[in-house]
Regions:
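Active-site beta3 strand of CheY-like receiver
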Residues: 44-50, 55
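Short hydrophobic/Thr-rich beta-strand motif most characteristic of the beta2 strand and flanking loop
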Residues: 25-32, 40
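The feature encodes the CheY-like receiver
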Residues: 14, 56, 86, 105
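Alpha4 helix (beta4-alpha4-beta5 surface) of REC/receiver domains from two-component response regulators
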Residues: 62, 85-102, 113
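Short amphipathic alpha-helix used as the core "switch/output" element in two-component signaling
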Residues: 39, 61-74
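Acidic catalytic/metal-coordinating carboxylates
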Residues: 32-36, 59-62
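Charged docking surfaces used in two-component/phosphorelay signaling
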Residues: 15-23
Length: 132
């Protein structure tokens, strides 16, 4: 069973997406704060992280960049999500190390498909080099 860490400060999002992912057979862990996101990754060792951009105590881009520097998390795929319409965010997400970017609101099936695609890339992932 694969583990997904959802990092978002929206309780409704965490509940709705968490229930859907659990129904698909995933183990789901949650975190609501950028300050605890890195420790949540190290503690739970998820197979993938779904990370919101706007978080208390920081932003998802900084969390993604921190994870890229940790040997224990450098190959963990990250999907960055946001409700912002800023057109620069998808490129910024990829530069921060994300494998995918989704704009809220999105269908839970779209997230599940994105997770499956990222996980299907296999265990031969190399640490993602930070884009310059």
């Amino acid at each position: 069973m694969k583990t997904v860490l959802l990092v978002d400060d929206d309780n409704v999002f965490l509940l709705a997406i968490g229930v859907r992912l659990k129904s698909l057979g995933y183990t789901v862990c949650t975190c609501k704060d950028a300050a605890f996101a890195v420790s949540a990754v190290l503690k739970n060792n998820p197979d993938i992280v779904v990370l919101d951009v706007s978080l208390p105590a920081g932003d998802g881009f900084l969390v993604a960049e921190r994870l890229q520097k940790l040997p224990a998390a450098a190959t963990t795929p990250i999907i960055i999500v946001t409700a912002s319409e800023n057109p620069e965010l998808p490129e910024r997400a990829i530069k921060a190390g994300a494998v995918a970017f989704l704009r809220k609101p999105f269908d839970a099936a779209a997230l599940a498909n994105t997770i499956e695609t990222a996980l299907a890339q296999g265990d031969d992932r190399q640490p993602r080099a930070k884009a310059v």
